[in-house]
Swiss-Prot record:
Active site: 110 (n6-amp-lysine intermediate)
A GO term, aspect molecular function: DNA ligase (NAD+) activity
Main EC class the enzyme belongs to: ligase
The keyword rRNA processing is annotated on this UniProt entry: no
Name of this chain's protein: DNA ligase
Reaction(s) the record says it catalyses: NAD(+) + (deoxyribonucleotide)n-3'-hydroxyl + 5'-phospho-(deoxyribonucleotide)m = (deoxyribonucleotide)n+m + AMP + beta-nicotinamide D-nucleotide
InterPro entries reported for this sequence: BRCT_dom (IPR001357), BRCT_dom_sf (IPR036420), DisA/LigA_HHH (IPR041663), DNA_ligase (IPR001679), DNA_ligase_AS (IPR018239), DNA_ligase_CS (IPR033136), DNAligase_adenylation (IPR013839), DNAligase_N (IPR013840)
Amino acid sequence: MEAKKEIQELYEKLLRHNKKYYQDDSPEITDAEYDSIKDRYLKLLEANPSLGFPVVVGYPASEKFQKVKHLSPMLSLRNIFSEEELVEYIEKTKRFLNLKSALEFLCEPKIDGVSFSARYVNGKLVSCATRGDGKIGENIIDNMKVINGFPIEIMDVPDLLEVRGEVFLDHDTFQTLEGFSNPRNAAAGSLRQLNPEITNERNLQYFAYSASKIDGIEHQEDVLHFLSGRGFMTNPLRLASSKVPEIMSFYDSVYRRRSQIKYDIDGLVYKVNDLKLHARLGTLSDAPRWAIAHKFPSHRAKTILEKIKLSVGRTGIITPVAHLKPITIGGVVISRASLYNEDELERKDIREGDLVIVERAGDVIPKVLEVDISYRTNQERFIFPDKCPSCSSTLIRKNNEAATRCNNSKKCPEQVIQQIKHLVSAQAFDIDGIGTSHISFFIEKGFISEPADIFRLDKHRDEIKKYDGWGEKSVENILKNIKNSRKISLEKFIFSLGIKNIGEKTAYMLAQQFKSFANWFDKMSMLKDDTQTEDEIRNLDGMGSCICESLLDFFSDSDNCNMVKSLSNHVMITDHTVNIGGSLSGKKFVFTGTLLSITREEAKEIIKKAGGIVVNSISKQIDYVVAGEKAGSKLAKANELGIAIIEEKTLIEFTNGNNTPALKKETSSN
């Protein structure tokens, strides 16, 4: 049978692509191409139910993580692509319900991220699973716990509650990462790390969008209000309406604003707002009847790939870049597209001179989808070089890594350019007026060979002015901006060094812990022989072996130590200070037990903003223990060591304007 043969082929395709998408985090085709295959498969299944092929959802959970069975299946959504299909879906749904009156929908953005299902028992997070195959997912609870603002404990909820949502990376964060093809893949790769410290550095975000049954909640819109009231992040961009013109107007509005939204959206989801109707509508084999996804059209165009050039990143990652014959897509002129890595280049067999299909679908960087082979004549296969295009050093590629790297970090001109570009960025020294072209010029002419040379440029003032394009005013403005940027906080200085895995958040925590540059640098210089300092770093909330290894690798190199010392001699590094009264400045806190009126994450933020430091384990160096309900062994240990105990109420009073929390000595050890 022809139908059976086609269904079998489509089924095998879906299995392969689901594995690439859900388990490998490296999809080979676009969402639009996947949707086309899946829609064709489902239509053939409906027309040939006797053939007995299964509906494909997700992919079995990886063996790397513990498995979690979902309370109810995590289904996918059927798609529509036009107003006509929307009207047809609404009418079909009303016929199913035998409903004559209007049917209200809640319209929400469809985030292009990674789905999760978090389970709470008696208000405490006990598991958090990926979609997996829709029935069983991977337990990523440790990684979810480090996502900023994700509740670990919640109050006033059913004894058993399952909250679902989407984890994503915003565009700004994605731009700081290397080696990922798009924000969705980066989010998936970050969320499925075996080391939560790496996840912590990636600044993942999330939106919660549904919950299991809650007494008294009757509408989807109320579910979002309920979740928001208990500390979950929900997307404020939504509309409740029963009118197709209003729904389409909202769809068009979000679509037009898509490029201004700081995260990827690939459509809207329309959900029947009345939760009582969800049970009546039930589900299809792979999707609920009470919801549908209205996908955005992708922006695509064909153009000639004129050249493949290699870009060298700050950490040495080599990225192939397609230089295109300029083409306008969605009102934007596109002349370049990332080819991501050597594997991607080989898999798609992309060659110089090819006619390629380019897509700009809300991603930060346009992507080359595929090659139009019918146009190809005698183009030669692109051979990925084994030498760095900037310094000619031999490139290396570690096992199980997609990235190819140049390890000549100190002598590779392009890496030095990117390192100094990082140093002068707004998040570091914030030196206005110095761009890539300026840095390249300074390096080429020998004015800069290391970061500290930026602050020695005034010695070359007269020489710089002799070159074409360098007028008196432009040179003086740059030198003035450099002079005005010499004063820098300790956390920004640490971040400016570009140490692997040391982002802004980690730099702040290190500054908070070590207070002054002298103290921090002394401790880092002796880190390889100082297990006490290593333990001190590991014990900081959100830190661990990954951060320690990065610091150890960096400061084990005497050239790096000399570079930091040289840079520090040309700037003024201010000690870490907190400007909220300073009442908790330098005080170390440990939490134990369950907080009732605020979440533990909120309490941590209160302490950090007031200059305090949150650590994970009890020692003689701890100043306070914040004890909630059902406090455990940490409370007993605190009593043994004579550490002051703070009740939740006392901490709340402090946030309302009181000074340092009143201390009390606990005698109980429950």
